């Protein structure tokens, strides 16, 4: 494709085995019949799926190079024809343009593209004539499970949804049952003053998808995925609109969590012992500067120093426990490349976790906004080394981060990179097994961690390799053309991503070393840092 592609042609897997066709078969009458039959399907604006990866012998004379031809299972939109009646111009969701052969495509779900549903692009309307619905039993299962989530609003109308979301910060969201597609759901999100609606479609097997590329077993997994990265949506999911009618457990507490005063005292004693409890009178709370998993992030001032305040209500939204757990894990950590915990505020109507203020935001946003024209290779190397030094410190403390990615790296005034977001961190010798329910980012997590919950510092090393790929690709989403549910299977069959465009070979070698299938074959963070130091002095 014109923007490059991330597949490694040296690692074959079932979905991309080239199919050879003789020149005689191309000219056969049956093929011409197929071309004629597909004429309506190939009208500009239609969405199709590529059914086969064709080999160079399948090309007409003078056609472009192989990388300009879409591959098996790509979802593309037809742009128009070419001088060769067998070939059509098309574009995928990443805005990459290329070619498809007329008898190597089929309709999506057996239907021509309908303007009412734009794949991975909010249309403002979730109505598509003739769209099939899934079984009520599967829908009921998903609805029942989702009732325990604060962002699920069941049968709320579209009109009331827009009243709740309109004017809210970008990324504020809720999930509701679809009124026009019984059995499906709708993801609704505020963006640039408007409300965008994404249809969540159920497959015949009960899986859920927004784009027919990423599939999820339940709504919780889907929401967790899009909280980590927009991955084609207009914005990543940030702050849920809490449903006031959420179900309650048998003991009377909200199914998405509440905390008694006594329990809160017990769980915050670690901060008191560490001298990290700060009076609300000593904090000046300023404007909202972001939105995180727990709620708003606000700018504040403490002792004439700018700080960031993560805010959680004391009761009713189920996020207080997570905020306190993250803050508790940060107690005692001290390194120039880790975001520093300043303290917690417990005597306010809200609970605040106070950290140092990082003026340049997160790394993924900076990579994508500035790009290769503004960020020199030397700066990319500094990001990599900063992060690696922070991870060396965690390695020495036998702490596993478990969510290492560019989105969880923050940058200070001087663009020093610091690892943040310790919500999933644990001690390396911990016996907890909690990899279920979509908590962990599949494309960043080592295969043994996903398969067997084996989280070690070596699984963090794997994630660091993915982070390196993010840095040198200037913020691309890893495995951009592989469905999320297939990533582990491809990795175990030997597939690895190609080097990003312009990536130094020495850096790509480090990436591949961190992606050794066996955890014991991966280098330690100390060894990775030594390699990066050598590369920095030579590149």
UniProtKB/Swiss-Prot annotation:
Keyword terms: ATP-binding, Kinase, Magnesium, Manganese, Metal-binding, Nucleotide-binding, SH2 domain, SH3 domain, Transferase, Tyrosine-protein kinase
Binding site for ATP: 289-297, 310
Result for mutant: residue 310 to M: Loss of kinase activity. Reduction in src-1 and src-2-mediated tyrosine phosphorylation. Mutants arrest at L1 larval stage
Active-site residues, as the UniProt record annotates them: 403 (proton acceptor)
Function: Non-receptor tyrosine-protein kinase which plays a role in pharynx function by regulating pumping and the orientation of pharyngeal muscle fibers, independently of src-1 and src-2. May phosphorylate and thereby negatively regulate src-1 and src-2 activities.
Name of the featured protein: Tyrosine-protein kinase csk-1
EC number: 2.7.10.2
Natural source organism: Caenorhabditis elegans
Catalytic activity line of the entry: L-tyrosyl-[protein] + ATP = O-phospho-L-tyrosyl-[protein] + ADP + H(+)
Gene Ontology terms: cellular component: cell-cell junction; plasma membrane
Domain of life: Eukaryota
Region (Disordered): 129-148
GO BP terms in the entry: embryo development ending in birth or egg hatching; larval feeding behavior; muscle cell development; nematode larval development; nematode pharyngeal pumping
InterPro entries for the chain: Csk-like_SH2, Kinase-like_dom_sf, Non-receptor_tyrosine_kinases, Prot_kinase_dom, Protein_kinase_ATP_BS, Ser-Thr/Tyr_kinase_cat_dom, SH2, SH2_dom_sf
Tissue expression profile of the protein: Expressed predominantly in pharyngeal muscles in procorpus, metacorpus and terminal bulb. Expressed also in some neurons (ASE, ADF, AVA, AUA, RMDV and BAG) in the head region, anchor cell, vulva, cells around anus, body wall muscle and gondal distal tip cells.
GO molecular-function term, one example from the UniProt record: protein tyrosine kinase activity
């Amino acid at each position: 494709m014109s923007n490059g592609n991330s597949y490694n042609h040296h690692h074959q897997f079932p979905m991309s085995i080239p199919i050879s066709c003789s020149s005689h078969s191309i000219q056969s009458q049956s093929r011409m019949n197929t071309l004629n039959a597909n004429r309506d399907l190939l009208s500009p604006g239609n969405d199709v799926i590529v059914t086969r990866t064709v080999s160079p012998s399948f090309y007409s004379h003078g056609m472009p190079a192989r990388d300009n031809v879409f591959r098996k299972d790509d979802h593309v939109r037809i742009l128009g024809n070419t001088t060769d009646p067998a070939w059509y111009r098309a574009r995928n969701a990443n805005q990459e343009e290329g070619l498809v052969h007329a008898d190597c495509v089929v309709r999506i779900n057996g239907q021509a593209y309908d303007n009412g549903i734009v794949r991975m692009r909010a249309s403002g309307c979730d109505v598509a004539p003739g769209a099939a619905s899934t079984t009520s039993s599967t829908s009921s299962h998903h609805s029942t499970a989702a009732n325990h989530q604060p962002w699920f609003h069941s049968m709320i109308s579209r009109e009331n949804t827009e009243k709740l979301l309109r004017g809210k910060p970008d990324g504020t969201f809720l999930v509701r049952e679809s009124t026009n597609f019984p059995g499906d759901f709708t993801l609704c999100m505020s963006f640039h003053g408007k409300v965008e609606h994404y249809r969540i479609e159920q497959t015949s097997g009960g899986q859920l998808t927004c784009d027919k590329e990423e599939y999820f077993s339940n709504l919780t997994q889907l929401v967790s995925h899009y909280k980590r990265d927009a991955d084609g949506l207009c914005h990543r999911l940030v702050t849920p609109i809490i449903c006031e009618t959420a179900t309650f457990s048998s003991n009377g507490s909200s199914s998405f969590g509440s905390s008694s005063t006594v329990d809160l005292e017990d769980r915050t004693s670690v901060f008191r012992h560490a001298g990290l409890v700060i009076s609300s009178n000593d904090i000046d709370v300023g404007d909202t500067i972001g939105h995180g998993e727990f709620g708003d992030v606000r700018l504040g001032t403490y002792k004439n120093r700018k700080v960031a305040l993560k805010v959680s209500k004391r009761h009713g939204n189920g996020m207080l426990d997570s905020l306190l757990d993250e803050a508790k894990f940060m107690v005692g950590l001290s390194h120039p490349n880790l975001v520093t915990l300043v303290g917690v505020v417990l005597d306010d109507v809200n609970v605040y976790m106070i950290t140092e203020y990082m003026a340049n935001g997160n790394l993924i946003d900076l990579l994508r906004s500035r790009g290769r024209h503004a960020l020199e290779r030397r700066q990319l190397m500094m990001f990599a080394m900063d992060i690696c030094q922070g991870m060396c410190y965690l390695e020495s403390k036998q702490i596993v981060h478990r969510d290492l990615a560019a989105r969880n790296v923050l940058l200070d005034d001087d663009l020093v990179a610091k690892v943040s977001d310790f919500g999933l961190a644990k001690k390396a010798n911990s016996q907890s097994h909690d990899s279920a329910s979509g908590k962990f980012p599949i494309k960043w997590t080592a295969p043994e961690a996903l398969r067997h919950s084996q989280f070690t510092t070596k699984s963090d090393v794997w994630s660091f390799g993915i982070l390196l790929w993010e840095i040198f690709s200037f913020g691309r989403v890893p495995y951009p053309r592989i469905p999320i549910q297939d990533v582990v299977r491809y990795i175990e069959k030997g597939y690895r991503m190609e080097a990003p465009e312009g990536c130094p070979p020495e850096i790509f070698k480090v990436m591949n070393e961190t992606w050794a299938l066996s955890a014991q074959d991966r280098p330690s963070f100390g060894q990775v840092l030594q390699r990066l130091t050598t590369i920095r002095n030579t590149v």
